[in-house]
């Protein structure tokens, strides 16, 4: 089972109204947790693109200071994937301190981009592989994920060839969408070869249930605020 941590609505330090270093504080909790995530998705729907870029820079700078923490960072573009496609690549330039390992598409993105757009994203100047963490492997692939809420979304994600999907909500309502429940999750996940991660109201006590229902792992925003 793999685990995906999704950032809460944190801002980078210079914009935090409460002071302190919210990105560092969040990542420290994740780092000290008894279960290590395989991926962290940087997500904050309240930030514009420039603010999101600054947040990712701070997250990567913080991750580089954390020994033996080989988590991969994925950027949720807040529906601005086309902007990221149009910006790059720029030879020899990476705006992020350590770069990112991939992009997470919103359910809106799924229908606004084409498969060839993903090929352009793979050349993005936002991508940078930390070869010290990846043991010298210079062929580490760009990761693409997607948020899905129904069978139509999953079919489109499969057409684009994404590497994983977050299927939600499972146990709690999300933006007016009623919870799918485990029975529906299993039914939908068995219709695709894409690894599917349940999201929405989950904690570590749901791991065995998720595994029984064909989940590749579990994902959550508050997941790593809980004990395993």
Model-found features: residue ranges?
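Conserved N-terminal beta1-alpha1 strand-loop-helix module at the mouth
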Residues: 1-132, 137-164, 193-194, 204-215, ...
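Phosphate/ribose-phosphate-bearing ligand recognition and processing surfaces
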Residues: 175
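Short alpha-helical segments enriched in small residues
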Residues: 182
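Conserved donor-binding loops in enzymes that form glycosidic bonds
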Residues: 200-201
């Amino acid at each position: 089972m793999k685990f995906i941590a999704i950032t809460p609505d944190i801002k980078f330090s210079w914009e935090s109204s409460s002071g302190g270093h919210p990105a560092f504080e969040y990542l420290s909790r994740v780092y000290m947790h008894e279960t290590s995530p395989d991926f962290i998705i940087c997500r904050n729907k309240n930030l514009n693109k420039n603010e999101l870029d600054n947040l990712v820079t701070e997250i990567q700078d913080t991750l580089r200071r954390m020994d033996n923490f080989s988590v991969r960072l994925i950027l949720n573009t807040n529906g601005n994937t086309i902007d990221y496609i149009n910006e790059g690549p720029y030879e020899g330039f990476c705006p992020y301190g350590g770069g990112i390992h991939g992009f997470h598409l919103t359910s809106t993105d799924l229908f606004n981009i084409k498969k060839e757009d993903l090929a352009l994203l793979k050349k993005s100047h936002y991508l940078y592989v930390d070869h010290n963490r990846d043991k010298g492997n210079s062929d580490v692939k760009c990761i693409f994920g997607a948020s899905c809420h129904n069978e139509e979304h999953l079919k489109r994600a499969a057409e684009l060839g994404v590497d994983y999907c977050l299927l939600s909500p499972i146990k709690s309502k999300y933006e007016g969408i009623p919870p799918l429940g485990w029975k529906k999750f299993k039914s939908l996940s068995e219709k695709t070869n894409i690894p599917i991660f349940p999201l929405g109201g989950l904690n570590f006590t749901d791991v065995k249930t998720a595994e029984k229902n064909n989940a590749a792992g579990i994902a959550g925003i508050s997941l790593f605020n809980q004990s395993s």
